[in-house]
Amino acid sequence: MVRIVPSARRTRAPAKLDGRSTPDIAMSLVTTASPLTTADTYTPAADSDAPPAVRGELVINLPMRHAGQRELRLRYELVGAEQAPVVFVAGGISAHRHLAASAVFPEKGWVEGLVGAGRALDPASRRLLAFDFLGADGSLDAPIDTADQADAIAALLDALGIARLHGFVGYSYGALVGLQFASRHAARLHTLVAVSGAHRAHPYAAAWRALQRRAVALGQLQCAEHHGLALARQFAMLSYRTPEEFSERFDAPPELINGRVRVAAEDYLDAAGAQYVARTPVNAYLRLSESIDLHRIDPAAVAVPTVVVAVEGDRLVPLADLVSLVEGLGPRGSLRVLRSPFGHDAFLKEIDRIDAILTTALRTTGETA
């Protein structure tokens, strides 16, 4: 096990949630490269309602599927009541370890609306774990498989003394990683919720991403890779959302500016590209985009109860693919279908509807609706 080395702040090491060892064939290949990991831990005062929170790093040696043995750094955040059921949460390739603002980490998180009092992901009743995906900092210039992400999560659980997750909630790319985790480490997971993520990359979506990566490559040829990345993100926004939403939001006549036509959606797309470039290393985007297209599992290998959430009109993960996934899961799988104008981004917009699904899926013995 990896030993936690706390910082100078008020600290409490994460409690071991289950003393039993859980062997896993895939995990037997993972060894820690260092017995030490740094952690920044917060324990609230006795009269505080704030849950404990820890943010830390550790180093592992991981045999990657397409890149051989690598020394990798994992960055994680764990927030919630000690001894509460642990739920791992993972999002799209832009997501990170910080889910939502807390007493000790007050900055806004990427899934703010779904985490909080009264929600299925309530730190008062769940312990929420997340990490930065392998490759997210841009330092890993090698093919990254979703299986690598799943094995890294298993190594993180070992380091934190967590034998088994109560739930894994994955959105988009996180759903692909969740399916891999459920396939490779089934003994360590009770329930999977996979939102807008299938057992394979749809050929249409893979073609979209291939063109986005070519946009980045053209930018690199012109020594303007950030312009290429911004353009790739703008293309992506068209695939994340739906024609219906664009019709409602941007149905204004074009303008003539300096003799050029500018359509109503361009300001929105420009802002989306600029924001993405400001926070995303080019190499991180390229390698994680490729990782989506490398993803493929056999649904029959997923041996845990799995709730699959599909969105009608999702152009990246069509409903038909998720129907095929659930059919392959057999009695372990169930399907929920949402109608939303937000397409692939519905998991970030349809907060109450997603929360209702999570509440049912993650309910523990003795809990009521």
Curated annotation (Swiss-Prot):
It is an enzyme of class 2 (transferase). The record marks Y173 as: Important for substrate specificity. One of its GO terms (cellular component) is cytoplasm. The active site is at S172, D314, H344. InterPro entries: AB_hydrolase_1, AB_hydrolase_fold, HAT_MetX-like. Its EC number is 2.3.1.46. Substrate binds at R233, D345. It comes from the Bacteria. Residues 1-21 are annotated as: Disordered. This is Homoserine O-succinyltransferase. It comes from Xanthomonas campestris pv. campestris (strain ATCC 33913 / DSM 3586 / NCPPB 528 / LMG 568 / P 25). The gene is metXS.
